[in-house]
């Protein structure tokens, strides 16, 4: 099934946070795109990846971190550990099998934090101008 980018879904976390996402099922490993700082799933990199995944019949997950894009919350409450946990919750709920993480800018840093928790499910990582550690 081809999903339009206008078909936004929401996942409610244990504490009530509502995370907006797009998911298209398909062959694995599932591509999971992690946007950069103050970016969201409607950006050009995310939408291009989603369209290409659909064209190739690949599974793909895009999301907006809490406080970003179409997700609920205040951006000022965001932190890497919080966003990492949101990504992991969506993967646990919607993705079966191996995961290929794609991180852009700050999403590259988040990609490393998520990868630590995926262990054997991690098929690989692709960094697009990754920016781990802003200090």
Where are these regions (language model features)?
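Gly/Ala-rich beta-loop-alpha elbow adjacent to hydrolase catalytic centers
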Residues: 103-111
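Active-site nucleophile loop of the alpha/beta-hydrolase fold
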Residues: 126-135
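Conserved alpha/beta-hydrolase
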Residues: 50-72
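Catalytic nucleophile-loop/oxyanion-hole region of alpha/beta-hydrolase
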Residues: 69-94
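Short beta-strand element of the alpha/beta-hydrolase
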Residues: 28-36
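The serine-hydrolase catalytic nucleophile loop
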Residues: 37-50
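Short beta-strand immediately N-terminal to the catalytic nucleophile in serine-hydrolase-like folds
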Residues: 101-103, 128
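N-terminal cap/lid segment of alpha/beta-hydrolase-fold proteins
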Residues: 2-25
């Amino acid at each position: 099934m081809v999903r339009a980018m206008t078909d936004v879904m929401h996942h409610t976390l244990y504490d009530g946070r509502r995370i907006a996402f797009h998911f298209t099922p398909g062959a694995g490993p599932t591509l999971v795109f992690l946007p950069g700082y103050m970016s969201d799933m409607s950006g050009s990199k995310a939408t291009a990846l989603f369209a290409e995944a659909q064209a190739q019949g690949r599974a793909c997950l895009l999301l907006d971190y809490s406080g970003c894009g179409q997700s609920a919350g205040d951006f000022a409450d965001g932190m890497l550990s919080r966003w990492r946990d949101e990504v992991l919750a969506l993967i646990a709920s919607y993705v079966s099998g191996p995961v290929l993480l794609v991180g852009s800018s700050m999403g590259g840093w988040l990609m490393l934090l998520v990868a630590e928790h995926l262990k054997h499910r991690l098929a690989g990582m692709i960094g697009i101008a990754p920016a781990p550690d802003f200090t």
